Amino acid sequence: MSAYRRPAGLNDALGRLSAEPHRIIAGGTDVFPAAAAAVGWGRPGIDHPGRAPILDITAIEALSHIRRFPDRVEIGALVTWTEAIESDLPAWFDGVRQAAREVGGRQIQNRGTLAGNLCNASPAADGVPALLALDARVRLRRRGGSRDVPLESFITGNRRTCLRPEELMTTIVIPSPAPGARSTFLKLGARRYLVISIAMVAAGLEVRDGRIRGARIAVGACSEVARRLTRLEARLEGTRPEDAPGGVREEDFASLSPLNDVRASAAYRRHGARVLVTRALGALVHGEGAAR
């Protein structure tokens, strides 16, 4: 069977990655179900001798932090959804907390990590739009160096990222917003819980002197990669918050390329995204940061 390694320190992990490619595991909530499905279809499983060795990073304590700085918040690669929900982060992170509550069941939330959700790069990953709406970037470490990559550049396609074989995502970095900024997250699915998204939306607003001074709106599950609605964001700049929900237009969604599949038609996804954006902006205007 393939090798299994569980380093206790970050340098050890980076050294192993520099020597040969590994399959990295944190919570394992995506890797193991995918491997089981592969076996069911007659393909090699996770322990097949021909597969790359497994690198389990769960013993690296340096990756289990949430740290606050004057200009940013850093979320370590081992921070779970439950830890995000229970954190004392400000209202700017309400959208992340709401997305965390939508990820699977309690067991998945206790094991799964935000960083793993980003690295899995599913078009329907709940964490991606929530973090895109916060201008998140990811820190990729390698032996002897590191680089910070904007989240919108990190995910390059359906389950594809720019992570190199010798790199490990160690941190999610979120810039600190203006005081009073809020975010929210809304999801459309075939049922209320334990569902893969048909469409989802995260939105964040910074308001000063009665005007919007920063709007960030991201849509997931409506393209191969979650996307920011930059046209709408630009138009909302300088407007009154109460006018934002009524300012959503059909052309704001031109950058999306929703699929027709067993969950929904492309037209339904696009319509659902517009409804969710309007509702999310309305929730923020009325002070409902964690709208449901």
What are these regions (language model features)?
Residues 1-292:
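C-terminal structural segment of proteins
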